[in-house]
Regions:
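Basic/aromatic-rich interaction segments and small domains that mediate binding to polyanionic partners
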Residues: 2, 6-55
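Structured surface patches comprising rigid loops and adjacent beta-strands/short helices at the edges
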Residues: 54-62
Protein backbone atom coordinates (compact mmCIF):
# COMPACT_ATOMS: atom_id res chain seq x y z
CA UNK A 1 0.00 0.00 0.00
CA UNK A 2 0.98 3.59 -0.46
CA UNK A 3 -0.47 6.90 0.55
CA UNK A 4 -1.21 9.76 -1.82
CA UNK A 5 -1.18 13.18 -0.22
CA UNK A 6 -3.27 15.49 -2.36
CA UNK A 7 -3.44 18.51 -0.09
CA UNK A 8 -1.28 18.29 2.98
CA UNK A 9 -0.08 20.47 5.77
CA UNK A 10 3.69 20.51 5.92
CA UNK A 11 4.80 21.03 9.49
CA UNK A 12 8.23 22.58 9.36
CA UNK A 13 10.22 25.23 11.14
CA UNK A 14 7.79 27.94 10.12
CA UNK A 15 5.21 29.00 12.68
CA UNK A 16 2.37 28.77 10.17
CA UNK A 17 1.72 25.38 8.50
CA UNK A 18 2.12 25.43 4.72
CA UNK A 19 -0.68 24.05 2.56
CA UNK A 20 0.76 22.20 -0.42
CA UNK A 21 -1.40 21.19 -3.36
CA UNK A 22 1.15 19.07 -5.20
CA UNK A 23 1.04 15.29 -4.85
CA UNK A 24 3.52 13.54 -2.58
CA UNK A 25 3.66 9.80 -2.11
CA UNK A 26 4.52 7.85 1.00
CA UNK A 27 4.52 4.21 2.01
CA UNK A 28 2.27 2.80 4.70
CA UNK A 29 5.47 1.98 6.61
CA UNK A 30 5.92 5.73 7.09
CA UNK A 31 2.98 5.80 9.48
CA UNK A 32 3.99 6.61 13.04
CA UNK A 33 0.74 6.54 15.00
CA UNK A 34 -1.33 3.86 13.29
CA UNK A 35 -2.42 3.37 9.69
CA UNK A 36 -4.51 6.28 8.33
CA UNK A 37 -4.37 7.96 11.73
CA UNK A 38 -2.04 10.63 13.06
CA UNK A 39 0.96 11.84 11.12
CA UNK A 40 3.01 10.45 8.25
CA UNK A 41 6.73 11.05 7.82
CA UNK A 42 7.18 11.46 4.08
CA UNK A 43 9.92 12.64 1.74
CA UNK A 44 8.97 15.85 -0.04
CA UNK A 45 10.75 16.71 -3.28
CA UNK A 46 9.53 20.29 -3.04
CA UNK A 47 10.93 20.76 0.45
CA UNK A 48 13.86 18.41 -0.29
CA UNK A 49 13.43 16.92 3.18
CA UNK A 50 11.41 14.55 5.30
CA UNK A 51 8.25 16.28 6.44
CA UNK A 52 5.23 15.44 8.58
CA UNK A 53 1.89 15.02 6.81
CA UNK A 54 -1.49 14.77 8.52
CA UNK A 55 -3.44 11.64 7.58
CA UNK A 56 -6.72 13.50 7.16
CA UNK A 57 -5.19 15.29 4.19
CA UNK A 58 -4.52 12.13 2.22
CA UNK A 59 -6.11 9.07 0.71
CA UNK A 60 -4.89 5.50 0.64
CA UNK A 61 -4.12 3.79 -2.66
CA UNK A 62 -4.10 0.00 -2.95
CA UNK A 63 -1.06 -1.32 -4.79
Amino acid sequence: MRVEFIEMIVVGESIKPILVKSKVYGKSSDVKHGFRVGRYRVWSKRANALVWMWADHCRVIEE
